[in-house]
A protein has these predicted regions:
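A structural micro-motif
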Residues: 61, 90-91, 118, 145-147
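A short, conserved beta-to-alpha structural element at the edge of catalytic cores
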Residues: 97-98, 137-157
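Short, glycine/charge-rich flexible loops or terminal/linker lids adjacent to PRPP-binding catalytic cores
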Residues: 71-121, 128-136
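Short, solvent-exposed loop/turn segments at secondary-structure junctions
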Residues: 68-71, 154-156
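Active-site-facing substrate-recognition patch
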Residues: 1-57, 61, 96-119, 129, ...
């Protein structure tokens, strides 16, 4: 049973579905298991519907992820966000932002593929410090976007 958690970290509020890890698996194991993509989608879509609304429409809402730093192909978070977007009927904007460094804390993101929709769901698969979410918040707010932050796993107790 999902246990939602609203967390404020790095001056950003986000909703997470799981705390720490799923079934005692490491984050690397979770990302390597292709079936976990659909598991995340199936688990997160009802939560998004309940938190944001059941009548999310294309033209008003979009979904993005935080910048990809390591796995540019078959990126776990991007695959989940794209599946969520398809299920909800809203566009997924691939590569919304770029990060010039691999640093997570204090990162500054550059715009790349900013949604035209006014409301944006920012999805991140795993959150630890919240710095990545803060950088996305700063970027999207500069572009006058309303943001809702949804994460799969809150990786910090």
């Amino acid at each position: 049973t999902p246990k939602l958690r609203l967390t404020r970290r790095a001056s950003t509020n986000f909703i997470s579905l799981w705390q720490k890890s799923i079934f005692g698996r490491t984050l690397t194991e979770i990302k390597a298991d292709g079936s976990m993509v659909q598991f995340f989608i199936d688990s997160l879509v009802p939560i998004i519907n309940e938190c944001v609304g059941y009548h999310i429409s294309s033209g008003n809402w979009a979904i993005v992820t935080t910048p990809m730093r390591r796995h540019r192909e078959h990126n776990f978070a991007s695959r989940i966000a794209e599946g969520i977007g398809n299920t909800l009927g809203i566009p997924f904007y691939f590569d919304c932002a770029h990060c010039q460094s691999k640093q997570r804390v204090g990162a500054v993101f550059l715009p790349n593929n900013i949604p035209t929709e006014p409301n944006v769901i920012v999805f991140d698969d795993f959150v630890t410090t919240g710095s990545t979410l803060l950088a996305m918040k700063n970027l999207l707010h500069e572009h006058q976007k309303n943001t809702v932050f949804i994460t799969g796993i809150n990786n910090k107790l």
